[in-house]
Amino acid sequence: MMNKYLISLFLTVFSGVSFAQSNNPLSIYEGERVEFVTFDFASLPKDTLVALNISQKIENTYKIYPNMSYSSFMSDYYISQIGMYPFVEKVTIDISEPNENGISIKITVTLTENELAMSRNENIFKNRKAFPNIYTDSRSFLTFKFSSSEMIYSNNNAWFGQPKPILTGNPLVHNPEGDGYYGWLEGFAMAGIYGISKIIPRYNIHLYGGASYMVSFSCGREMFSDKSRFYGGLEDAFIGLIGGGRTLRGDNYSYNMLYGRKQFILADGFLLINTSMNGDNRAALQLNPRWAAKDLFQASFKIDRLSIGAFHFKPNELPILNSNTTINGINVELGSKDRVLIGASFLHVPRSTLRYFLANGDVFFRRGLQVYNIRLFINPPQGKDGLFFKTEGAYQRNSNFNMGAFAFYGEAGWRFTETKGAPSIGYRFAYFSGDNPSTSRYERWDALYTGGNGEQWVQGSNMYKMVQNSNELSHRLQAIYNPMPKLQLVMQLWLFYAPRLLNLGGNAALSNLSSHYLGSEVNLTVKYFKSRNWYFHLNTAYTFAGSAITENVEKTKNWFCLSTFVRYSF
């Protein structure tokens, strides 16, 4: 029973270990929420009606809209289709550095007065300059994707200098780092082919898919192990149908169905984003390059500003921590053009062997979990100073036993868009319930597959490795500043508390607390988006153990980490 308890415990702990910036192998922006999409036209015809028709045709071709999750492959396809128009001389895309509400996309189109009659088709076998695109015509797009990244990560006094009591019973541990300074190297490389083709032009129906293979490695003494590891495996492997058009009333509609291996993200990752695990035999623990869920089925329909979707998937967990979890869900969102989004979701877990352990010795299973979720996002006006606001709440129950867990957050701040460097400052309060042993109801929040990056739900570069969005109350003050183009600084100050003193289901060393104060952390992230191909990242954090930790673990020391990675992709 104890062994099963520890595996269930560390499944919860380990599933959330992530880094401070999404490192999805497809794109550094992959999965980011799209805040704004704008178009800039050069050399529009003087005839107003002709100019309007051309601009509308181009804008309707790029079918990534505000409040959607960014897909680099679909974006590349839409850009290639715009470039096929005979009246287009050149088209480029620029993606802003991420902010609190996601990314902004700017598409610049240069038109030609004389329509070019020459073929716009690309074929790498005839023209090597087409690379990485393999083949492109007015109906099809086939491209090669590649990414590679290496990281140096270091800690001073990891696990607050006390790895033995904090990691006792962890099945992944083999001589971990701890007291003193340690560093290690890890990396990954991914290669894949992705394509899409319009198979029924009359109804604008496209068949699309992709497959990729990834290798990863770790070398040195890291968070859990000093074993050098090298691993290779399939990452993406999916196929789908996508299409759309315009109703008789003039409303745009689109639909999408997909099956296979691919990452799934719900909203900004409050519930679901880390749909695969890294580390252990897969290596690359902190780079966190694997995201693809297994057996993902996703279907969505969007008309005008209303979107309805359904999904089913199995998270790609580590074999030693596999909980055999299956998640089904529906999601409904209603948004304005680009300012406001209202959403609601329902999740159901029909299958899982993950256990919940109670203070009285009872054991329950995640199987039967139901999650009800609502959210509201508000963006400031495009290009202007303004308020941003985000809030989300969720309630968990279980059809097999008495459960009632609750989580919510509220984030508000001000973005100074019209000021040099476009700084912003915001405050976020987040609460994830813990279990009250004096009631008959189980109340500890199940963190599911949250995470993402340091501006999403990785709450603290170091503290997140101790406490993973369950029985946790956090305060975050965050400032973002862009001192020069393509360079971004993210500064965070954190305070962490445990709402309940009973912490069974969290870190084993902190199962019973005598204080609510978990600690504090200050961190700084430097991001340099040199180009669409090159990205540089540095993160440092200093974490102070609070009385809830120091009273359970003797002789703790403050925890410092410093890491940097470079990434190349196309």
Positions of PLM-derived features:
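Sec-dependent N-terminal signal peptides
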Residues: Y5-S15
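N-terminal periplasmic/intermembrane-space "pro-region" immediately following the signal or transit peptide
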Residues: F19-L185, M190-R202, I425
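Signature for the C-terminal beta-barrel architecture of outer-membrane proteins
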Residues: F125-Y135, G245-R246, G250-Y255, M277-T439, ...
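Transmembrane beta-barrel strands of outer-membrane/channel proteins
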Residues: F144-S154, L207-V215, M257-Q263, I308-K314, ...
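Outer-membrane beta-barrel translocator domains and adjoining extracellular loop/strand segments
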Residues: N156-P163, C219-S225, G269-S276, P315-I327, ...
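Surface-exposed loop and membrane-interface regions of Gram-negative outer-membrane beta-barrel proteins
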Residues: P163-A189, G195-Y255, L272, S399, ...
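Extracellular/periplasmic loop regions
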Residues: F357, E392-A394, N402-N482, K486-L493, ...
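Outer-membrane beta-barrel "beta-signal"
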Residues: K557-F570
